[in-house]
């Protein structure tokens, strides 16, 4: 939402037109909405902007605390808000999906799977990316844990020890495995 800030509906419509003219499609609105953080920006302008863009999916973040720091009240708050925004998005024919990321409730395979399981009755999905510094087997386990909730894959390659970003080709062997696992998941992503 840096390029098309929430609430800037006219700009979103223009970007949608420009995107279609270029022969492209909007795959997602990459918002920075923090689920469960009521004191922050509201979801409704995010939803309106995604609609104007023609984005079928809105990326959201599972709170502001990592799973190790989150207490039960935090988890309940995130789950309740996720249900609320998923319902709003569904009314508009859209879907929300969590960023799979550090310092949120999707920062471990187990926590991400637990959150998605708690939201089983909703259409909430998940992005997936290989966690920085994690071994390939752990990354694959996370991708499998997301399973049929997979919406999109973020492709990056990081040096496991230094955590420096590398050319994607440097991770080719791992990415062949990740993409094969993603391809085995039903649906488009």
What are the residue ranges of the model-derived segments?
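N-terminal pre-domain/capping segments
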Residues: 1-57, 83, 90, 121, ...
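Flexible, glycine- and charge-enriched loops at secondary-structure boundaries
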Residues: 5-12, 40-43, 68-78, 105, ...
